[in-house]
Amino acid sequence: MSTVIKRPTRACVIGHVKIGGDAPVVVQSMTNTDTADYLATALQTAELARAGSELVRITVNSPEAAAAVPKIREHLDRMNCNVPLIGDFHYNGHRLLTEHPACAEALAKYRINPGNVGFGKKKDEQFAQMVELACKYDKPVRIGVNWGSLDQELLARVMDENSRRAEPLDATEMMRHAMVTSALESAAKAEEVGLASEKIILSCKVSSVQDLIAIYRDLSQRANYALHLGLTEAGMGSKGIVASTAALSVLLQEGIGDTIRVSLTPEPGGSRSQEVIVAQEILQTMGLRAFTPMVAACPGCGRTTSTFFQELAGEVQDFVRAKMPEWKLRYDGAENMTLAVMGCIVNGPGESKHANIGISLPGTGEAPSAPVYEDGEKTVTLKGDNIANEFKQIIERYVERTYTKKLKS
């Protein structure tokens, strides 16, 4: 695993999930269903949890949504899905939590946006009201600052202060400073109201990679609250994945961050679970967590004119991901297994020997056989039309004999 030294933050418990302190970085996701449709929201929440999301955030934006929250929690419990629910509030959270105590109780954490919790004279009053409710129900709070909804009064104030500096900050520096100031001042206000410091999580989300890195570096140096990382509005497909990975990996490598979310825009009709898989793969690729066996595969070249190795790599990845829930219940350590599916003799045997299990498929003009290596030793050579199924059986047998069986409770 990684030698990254995590920066010390205050430990916080969200439902049954510990974040901060000495806890590993936790994966979070968010539903995109209408929360008032409690069944659809419960089903998508369960889907995200099955994919590996350890915390799930849901929008609570109306009386109907607030009334649905306890039903969602109840339905999840009946499905044996104990993932903690986070309520995402904007504008009217103070009223919804007051008028719907069952919602306030069913949620494991509240998200408050200091930029729109209230305006003018009502801002501090409504912020304090939400914090008091968090204290009443013993819930942690994420103070989530977002550049798109930054507190305009605060922004005007810090801009005025900046104009009087001997060396004023430029526009980018001002934006970063305002984001951090909003988060820290809001946290201080929450503590003044009575919320314990270990009940506070901070986030400052922007859509620029460099801005996100600079903001969180500053934030982590100025306070030790638990931090939630995420690049807001990362985008679709490879752009969203690359942008989120570029931002989060730098911060995680520096030991910054206690929870992460990859905010991908899904394809129409696409699975919301993709954001969970990407978050897990970021953490596992960096050696910070282990969730499922990693499959190494070569990119292919002129020596690999057959597409079979590509098809097999995808099939093996799908196989181990599908088997992992069962393996997780039965065995300790299977998530650390490494696999290699290689396409020719150049790097195939070498990469295969370095994995726990590897297969080197024949390239163009090579003998039609595929040697299999287990822990560096060649164990069998596969031939014929059933290589995929035989290789998956080898993986299954390896798991059964290699990893310690868990005792039944």
UniProtKB/Swiss-Prot annotation:
Cofactor names: [4Fe-4S] cluster
Record: residues binding [4Fe-4S] cluster: 298, 301, 344, 351
Keywords: 4Fe-4S, Iron, Iron-sulfur, Isoprene biosynthesis, Metal-binding, Oxidoreductase
Cofactor note: Binds 1 [4Fe-4S] cluster.
Gene3D superfamilies, sorted: Dihydropteroate synthase-like, Sulfite Reductase Hemoprotein, domain 1
Catalytic activity: (2E)-4-hydroxy-3-methylbut-2-enyl diphosphate + oxidized [flavodoxin] + H2O + 2 H(+) = 2-C-methyl-D-erythritol 2,4-cyclic diphosphate + reduced [flavodoxin]
Principal EC category: oxidoreductase
UniProt record, GO biological process: isopentenyl diphosphate biosynthetic process, methylerythritol 4-phosphate pathway; terpenoid biosynthetic process
Family matches, as InterPro entries: Dihydropteroate_synth-like_sf, IspG_bac, IspG_bac-typ, NO2/SO3_Rdtase_4Fe4S_sf
UniProt-listed Enzyme Commission number(s): 1.17.7.3
An example molecular function term from Gene Ontology annotations: 4-hydroxy-3-methylbut-2-enyl-diphosphate synthase activity (flavodoxin)
This protein's pathway: Isoprenoid biosynthesis; isopentenyl diphosphate biosynthesis via DXP pathway; isopentenyl diphosphate from 1-deoxy-D-xylulose 5-phosphate: step 5/6
NCBIfam families attached to this UniProt entry: ispG_gcpE, PRK00366.1
Similarity remark: Belongs to the IspG family.
Function: Converts 2C-methyl-D-erythritol 2,4-cyclodiphosphate (ME-2,4cPP) into 1-hydroxy-2-methyl-2-(E)-butenyl 4-diphosphate.
Name this polypeptide is given: 4-hydroxy-3-methylbut-2-en-1-yl diphosphate synthase (flavodoxin)
